Regions:
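Hydrophobic alpha-helical transmembrane segments of polytopic
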Residues: 14, 18-25, 54-64, 92-99, ...
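Structural signal for membrane-spanning alpha-helices in multi-pass inner-membrane proteins
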Residues: 29, 68-72, 107, 130-134
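Polytopic alpha-helical membrane-helix bundles and their juxtamembrane interface segments
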Residues: 34, 39-40, 56, 63-67, ...
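Interfacial loop at the N-terminal end of multi-pass membrane proteins
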Residues: 2-15, 33-58, 78-82
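Mid-chain, well-packed structural core segment of small domains
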Residues: 71-106
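Short helix-capping/hinge motifs at transmembrane helix termini and TM-loop junctions
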Residues: 36-37, 44, 75, 110-111, ...
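Membrane-helix boundary connector in multi-pass membrane proteins
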Residues: 102-119, 134-137
């Protein structure tokens, strides 16, 4: 396998890892929106059961993150379809890098030890994987 093929495998693998992690995030957000009392691991860990406004926020976030997973998979060359036109995939991928960078910082400074323990490594992995996809893809 030459270096071009190795780079393509790396990018596809990174894209798949990011998509799986986003899938876990989407599932978590859907469960929060449904009222599962896991709020201590989200939104600063203020309440086990989220109030209605945060449940709605989780529902919206689940949809947005699912769409971003498709963008990452498209940028990584795993799928040919995404919810955005091809010309927007690059800029949207950089927006995602920015979101994961912010998420990593916020998860590092959250007052919730549980949220930090779960989501700091996840957000850092999503940031690293998305950077691989964007820079090498």
């Amino acid at each position: 396998m030459d270096s071009t093929e190795q780079a393509a495998v790396l990018v596809r693998t990174a894209g798949l890892v990011v998509a799986v992690l986003i899938g876990a995030l989407v599932a978590f957000q859907v469960l929060l929106a449904a009222g599962v009392p896991w709020g201590r691991a989200a939104y600063g860990g203020q309440a086990a059961e989220l109030p209605a406004n945060l449940r709605v926020s989780s529902a919206v976030a689940a949809v947005v993150w699912a769409l971003f997973a498709l963008v990452v998979l498209r940028r990584a060359g795993v799928t040919a379809w995404s919810p955005l036109p091809a010309a927007w995939i690059g800029p949207a991928s950089w927006v995602l890098v920015g979101l994961f960078a912010v998420a990593t910082v916020l998860n590092a400074i959250t007052p919730s030890a549980l949220e930090r323990a779960i989501w700091l490594p996840v957000s850092a992995l999503m940031l690293a994987g998305t950077l691989v996809v964007v820079l090498r893809g």
